Amino acid sequence: KTLYNYIESGVFRELAGITSLDLRRQVSRKLPKKKAQVYKKRKDNKYLKGRTYRDYKTYISDNPDVFVVQMDTVYNNESNGPFLQTFKFVKTGLLFAIYHEEKTSIAMKNGVDLLESILGQMLFRKYVHILLTDRGSEFSAAEAMECSPDGTRRTRVYYCDPMQSGQKGTLENKHVELRYILPKGADLRALGLNGQEDLNLAISHVNSAPVELLGGKSPLELTDFMYHDLYKKLYDFGIQQIDKDHVILKPYLLKK
């Protein structure tokens, strides 16, 4: 080892207080490959301020009756899509999804805009009081998602802790059902998923399956009973109840 190596490894730090910053050449020396990997550019996390999972828990503790919607993305091919922006209305277990060709923060913000246009501003603010999502870069446009096109606040966005998808576990569980139709690793377009209409069909079948925790009712039935105005808006968009005997949770559902 050279003297430089010993100084960089900290051998002389205790004896003489010499560090690598005391080396004249160190300022201009290129970082070794291993060290370069350690000093990664810090990610801008300003959007998390006031929106952490702890902030979320505090807010719902103070406002226990608010409607929470969990949000995520589902996809198989990260480079070519398609990308599904999923929403779960927690109170009834209803799953909704929007089809995208891109997984960008602009696309996800546009997805929230579309959901608002489907429900209308008043119902959106009633039923999407909170959006809880993960820290994926596609969801980093917090302020844009929180505001309607007219600039007024429409919802509050909060983020799960890193590597804690279980904090929105009810949505993850719903993804399991969706994956019966859209298996991981499959070419989703080859399966027949080529647009919003195809996605609506898949979502309709998932939401029409009876759920034991709902007393054998489906999420669509429960939504119709408890929040008919929400049900009607989604019905008009193409999310429709399928007879229980005709529910298909298999990949061949979308075959033309």
What name fits each language-model region?
Residues 1-192, 196-204, 208-211, 219-256:
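Secondary-structure boundary/capping micro-motif
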